[in-house]
UniProtKB/Swiss-Prot annotation:
Belongs to the HesB/IscA family. InterPro entries: FeS_biogenesis, FeS_cluster_insertion, FeS_cluster_insertion_CS, FeS_cluster_insertion_RrpA, HesB-like_dom_sf. Iron-sulfur cluster binds at residues 42, 106, 108. Homodimer. GO terms for cellular component: cytosol. This is Iron-sulfur cluster insertion protein ErpA. GO terms for molecular function: 2 iron, 2 sulfur cluster binding; 4 iron, 4 sulfur cluster binding; iron ion binding. It comes from Citrobacter koseri (strain ATCC BAA-895 / CDC 4225-83 / SGSC4696). Gene3D superfamilies: HesB-like domain (2.60.300.12). GO terms for biological process: iron-sulfur cluster assembly. Keywords: Iron, Iron-sulfur, Metal-binding. Binds 1 iron-sulfur cluster per subunit. Required for insertion of 4Fe-4S clusters for at least IspG.
Length: 114
């Protein structure tokens, strides 16, 4: 997908830059960052991130800086309007999801409710 198209989920420059660096370390240019949602966590749903070299039927792929972010259709419905970012701070570095659909989030930011 092109950066010029209005996307249901944003993939920030900071996240793409970090993914690019991590993929280079893995020496597998086919890897993409997959973001997904599972049941669990202290608020009912939790975000997950993994590297994947497969894109399944129905998955949405967002390309930025030559790397891809992949989301399955079930997870995407909970992420529409959100963004995947990468932050570094006093609490460490991590990928984070900004999700306007979340009614509440836990203190760590990895769990949410709808």
């Amino acid at each position: 997908m092109s950066d010029d198209v209005a996307l249901p989920l944003q993939f920030t420059e900071a996240a793409a830059k970090k993914v690019k660096s991590l993929i280079a370390d893995e020496d597998n240019p086919n890897l993409k960052l997959r973001v997904y949602i599972t049941g669990g966590g202290c608020s009912g749903f939790q975000y997950g991130f993994t590297f994947d070299d497969q894109v399944n039927e129905g998955d949405m792929t967002i390309e930025k800086q030559g790397v891809g972010l992949v989301v399955d259709p079930m997870s995407l419905q909970y992420l529409v309007g959100g963004a995947v970012d990468y932050t570094e701070g006093l609490e460490g570095s991590r990928f984070v999801v900004t999700n306007p659909n979340a009614k509440s989030t836990c203190g760590c930011g990895s769990s949410f409710s709808i």
